[in-house]
Amino acid sequence: MNKVPKKPLPSLLAVIGYPFTIAFSIFSFFQIGFNLEDFKRNFANRRLVTDTLFNPKWDWAIENASQALIETIQIAILASILGCFIALPLSFYASRATNQTTTTYFIYKSFLNFIRTIPDLFWAMLFTVAVGLGPFAGVLALVMFSMAIMGKLLSETIDSIDLGPLEAAKASGAKHNQAVFSSALPQILPNFTAYFLYIFELCIRASVILGLVGAGGVGRIIETQRIFLRFDRISPIIIFILVIVIGIEQFSVWLRRKIL
């Protein structure tokens, strides 16, 4: 007679982990000042926002925010191009597959890790002090932002390339840089293109936030109108940004299908 196998006992991690996670989540709600009564009371004030937010002033937005939206796109394009192409050679030095020297590998890897830990908003505040308010500060901030993300994504991609062509190029007498250029670079170019489009999309969103600290773009208009509770002027700007981001995302998906 076949015996029904016993159901295995839950692991120690499950016995301890799940209750701990639930208890810690409840504790965190109280720590951040969450209060259900305050939430209900403040939620009743939502009409201060929603009544105007869903009544967009299209004419005002087209007349006053069009140039700032174009500036936002220009900031994102320039920063993405500069940041990603600066990160391209750095990524090869930050990968074990193409850089066998421990010292230089550690230096470049640490540099990319360092700039990635600094928020883009801090870069924006730093550069607005260094070069003044305006889109140039935003471009510099997003260059650092783009370089950090591309450096991480691309260096990890290089780590997983096929080393066969690289070793064959070296065996045929090519120098290290020549071997990398002829054998490793072609393998990661499709990924580089896909990452570039992804970072460009991120820069569009980030440039809106950077405008809040005076780094150019449409963010400064959004912040000004928010102060005066003119959400009817903010909502069409948000819709414009949404359309731009969706368009970039769809183009990115189409292009990735073509090249990957």
Regions found by a protein language model. Give the residues of each.
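Membrane-cytosol interface at the C-terminal ends of specific transmembrane alpha-helices
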Residues: L133-A184, P190-I199, Q250
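C-terminal transmembrane helix and the adjacent membrane-cytosol boundary/short C-terminal tail
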Residues: A14, S235-L260
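Cytoplasmic-entry segments and transmembrane alpha-helices of multi-pass inner-membrane transporters
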Residues: L90-A124, L153-E156
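Glycine-rich helix-loop "coupling/hinge" segments at transmembrane-helix boundaries
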Residues: V129, R205-I241, L260
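Alpha-helical membrane-protein architecture signal
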Residues: W58, I62, S66, I70, ...
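Generic hydrophobic transmembrane alpha-helix motif, especially the helices
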Residues: L112-S146
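Hydrophobic positions within alpha-helical transmembrane segments of bacterial inner-membrane proteins
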Residues: S80-L88, F92, R96, L121, ...
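N-terminal, non-cleaved signal-anchor transmembrane helix
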Residues: M1-I81, L88-P89, Y93, T103
